[in-house]
């Protein structure tokens, strides 16, 4: 046996001798809390996110949008000045959603998730890139956006944000 092992054994023996006769304390000051059901919270959160992403968009609803000129929309309570600022690119989008190659269902889900994300993180302007392609998403995206209560206005994006293939979206963020 090495010198190191004997020192270790001596230390262990001294400790054992020092704590001989000690009784285990009964824990009486801290009350154990039952474990929280994190699975249930996760299910509620995912259900809420799913309802955020798909609740507002209907393919049957057709809002009144201008047929002439660039694609644009504003709620009744939004001034035309805000739409003009969107058109000019004064608002710089903080979030970009690229819907190229998505199906209509995927695009709806992602659009709803993007709006929910923007509202949660207090982001006022986002860019939705629907592309030009076969014009399916280009026609549907404005119809879906006009249905959402958090969308104040949208306008065809300036060239630096996608031009004909994108929309700048102005969102209302509820005060907390």
Curated annotation (Swiss-Prot):
Quaternary structure, from the entry: Associates with collided ribosomes, but not with correctly translating polysomes.
Biased composition (Basic and acidic residues): 39-51
UniProt organism field: Vibrio parahaemolyticus serotype O3:K6 (strain RIMD 2210633)
Record-listed E.C. numbers: 3.1.-.-
Gene Ontology terms: biological process: rescue of stalled ribosome
Domain Smr: 97-172
UniProt keyword terms in alphabetical order: Endonuclease, Hydrolase, Nuclease, RNA-binding, rRNA-binding
GO MF annotation list: RNA endonuclease activity; rRNA binding
Protein known as: Ribosome rescue factor SmrB
Top-level enzyme category: hydrolase
Region spans: Disordered: 29-51
Entry's family note: Belongs to the SmrB family.
Function comment: Acts as a ribosome collision sensor. Detects stalled/collided disomes (pairs of ribosomes where the leading ribosome is stalled and a second ribosome has collided with it) and endonucleolytically cleaves mRNA at the 5' boundary of the stalled ribosome. Stalled/collided disomes form a new interface (primarily via the 30S subunits) that binds SmrB. Cleaved mRNA becomes available for tmRNA ligation, leading to ribosomal subunit dissociation and rescue of stalled ribosomes.
Superkingdom of this protein's organism: Bacteria
């Amino acid at each position: 046996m090495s010198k190191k092992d004997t020192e270790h054994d001596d230390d262990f023996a001294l400790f054992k001798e020092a704590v001989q006769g000690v009784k285990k304390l009964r824990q009486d000051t801290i009350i154990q809390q039952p474990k929280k059901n994190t699975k249930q919270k996760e299910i509620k959160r995912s259900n809420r996110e799913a309802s955020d992403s798909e609740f507002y968009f209907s393919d049957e609803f057709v809002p009144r949008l201008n047929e002439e000129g660039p694609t644009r929309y504003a709620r009744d309570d939004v001034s035309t000045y805000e739409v003009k600022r969107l058109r000019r690119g004064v608002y710089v989008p903080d979030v970009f959603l690229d819907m190229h190659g998505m199906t209509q269902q995927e695009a709806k889900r992602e659009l709803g998730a993007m709006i929910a994300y923007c509202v949660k993180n207090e982001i006022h302007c986002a860019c939705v890139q629907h592309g030009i392609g076969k014009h399916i998403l280009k026609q549907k995206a404005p119809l879906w956006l006009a249905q959402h209560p958090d969308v104040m206005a949208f306008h065809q994006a300036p060239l630096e944000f996608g031009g004909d293939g994108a929309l700048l979206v102005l969102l209302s963020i509820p005060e907390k």
